[in-house]
Design a protein with these regions (language model features):
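Short, flexible, glycine/charge-rich loop motifs used to bind or transfer phosphoryl groups or to couple energy/partner
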Residues: 1, 36, 146
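Short, contiguous acidic/charged loop-to-helix segments that flank catalytic cores in large enzymes
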Residues: 23-24, 62, 133-135
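Catalytic cores of secreted or luminal carbohydrate-active enzymes
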Residues: 32-121
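Single conserved hydrophobic/aromatic residue that forms the stacking wall/gate
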Residues: 1-7, 12
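Beta-sheet entry/capping signal
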Residues: 8-9, 44-47, 155
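Serine-dependent acyl-ester chemistry module
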Residues: 16-27
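C-terminal beta-sandwich/jelly-roll accessory domains of carbohydrate-active enzymes
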Residues: 102, 109-186
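An acidic- and aromatic-residue-enriched active-site/binding cleft used to recognize and process polar
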Residues: 13-17, 50-53
Length: 186
């Protein structure tokens, strides 16, 4: 991405789509998405999330229109200065207190939405660093995550996988970016 930035030119790209891939070969996709998200720290960059339009067995999503529309939103906001919600929610901060974590996001538009039922794809880990499914619910403009067994939370992940079953969106129908608070490489 750095190499495409010359002067004040804008670089807008999509983020790696959901994909199962081959075991042992494509297991680093969450880490690649994480690095892609960090690239937003580079000036004159914007990104559209394609996680929810991917195909389980094809890295190239057939739904190109949705990806294109999301890239266009990013261009309208970043290049043309339109005041609109152009990105899905991005984790800003996590407050952990005992067996509960409150996750705060940027880019929520008018609020957060759980598409197709209760929130999914949230995991928590304690001192043992073993991630387990967690209960999550929208709490105002944040998400509250709780460990199912009441154990203390040390770390939180969302949609951390090659083809996660994630469903957190903002009011503009844009999906939340996967994230993790840990630095465990698995």
């Amino acid at each position: 991405i750095r190499s495409c930035l010359v002067g004040s030119e804008m670089c807008i790209r999509d983020r790696l789509a959901g994909f199962n891939g081959k075991p042992g070969v494509h297991e680093n996709y969450p880490h690649i998405r994480e690095v892609q998200l960090k690239a937003l720290d580079i000036p004159n960059t914007a990104m559209a999330l394609a996680l929810d339009v991917g195909e389980a067995n094809d890295i190239h999503p057939k739904n190109k229109k949705t990806v294109g529309e999301r890239l266009a939103l990013a261009a309208r906001a970043s290049v043309y200065g339109e005041q609109l919600c152009y990105s899905g929610p991005i984790m800003r901060e996590v407050d952990i207190q005992g067996s509960t974590a409150i996750i705060h996001f940027d880019h929520i538009g008018d609020g957060l939405v759980a598409k197709d039922g209760a929130l999914r794809a949230f995991q928590v880990a304690g001192q043992d660093a073993e991630f387990k499914t967690a209960k999550a619910s929208i709490l105002g403009h944040s998400v509250q995550v709780e460990s199912l067994d009441g154990s203390l939370i040390k770390e939180v992940r969302y949609a951390w996988g090659g083809y996660p079953d994630s469903n957190l969106y903002n009011s503009a129908a844009l999906p939340a970016a996967p994230f993790r608070t840990d630095k465990i490489n698995r």
